[in-house]
Amino acid sequence: MLSPHEPVGGPSTDAIDIDACSDVLVKNCYMAVNDDAVALKGGKGPWADTAPENGPNERIILEDCEYGFCHGCLTFGSENVHSSNIIMRNIKVSTGYNFLWLKLRPDTPQCYEHVLVENITGRAANFLNINPWAQFYDAKGRTDFPISRCDDITIRGCAFECDTYFNVKADEEHYHLSNFKLEDLDIKAVFTDCDRTAVENLEISDVRIVKKDTIDYPDSVTTMDAENSVIGK
C-alpha cells in the first residue's frame, strides 16, 4: 500500500483503517503512506461511546509487516472510542514519524487497553507517543466528560533508533495512563528521558538506552491543538 511522501506529498491517506472491527489479521504487508499506516478508528465526539453507529476494535493482530514512511505505524485514534486486545509483532520500520501512537481526544471518551507490541526493529522520530489530539475539537456543550484511559500496554523485545524514546504527556484532567511494561528494549535516542510520573504502575526492565546527538526528524508530528495546528517536539 503506497502513497507518496516526497518529493511531492500525496493526499492524506491511511494505508489501513480498522473501524469498529473484531477479529482482524494484518499480515505480510508493506505500507508506506503520507499519513498513518494502520489506524484504529471507531467514532469521535462527546457521546461517541453510546452512539449506535460506533463501536470497539477487538482482537486485532498485525504481524510480519514492513513499513516505509508513515506518520504512525500503529495509531490509536484519534477517532476511536475503544480498542482492546491488540497485538503487533515481528515488524520492521525503515522510517517514519511515530512508531506506537496513542491519540487522546479531549472531546471524546476513549479507552485503549490490553495492547502487546513485541519484536520490532527500525527507526522513527518517536518510539512511543501519547499526547492530546484536539483536531476538530467540539465538545457540543458537554461538560461532564469521563476520564479516558490507556491500560495494560506492554512493549518488549524491540531494537529501535529514534529522536524521542518516551514522548508521553500526562493530562489527568482528560486521561489516565496505567499498567505499562517496557521490557528488553535496545533504544538509541536524542531525548532519552522517561517521565515515570506520567503512568501509574510503570514497570521498566532490561531497557538499554544509548544517547545519540543528531535529530533526524525535525518536522515530525507529535500532537495537534484545537486550532488544528501541528505541534512537533
What would you call each of these model-derived segments?
Residues 1-233:
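Extracellular/periplasmic carbohydrate-active domains that bind, remodel
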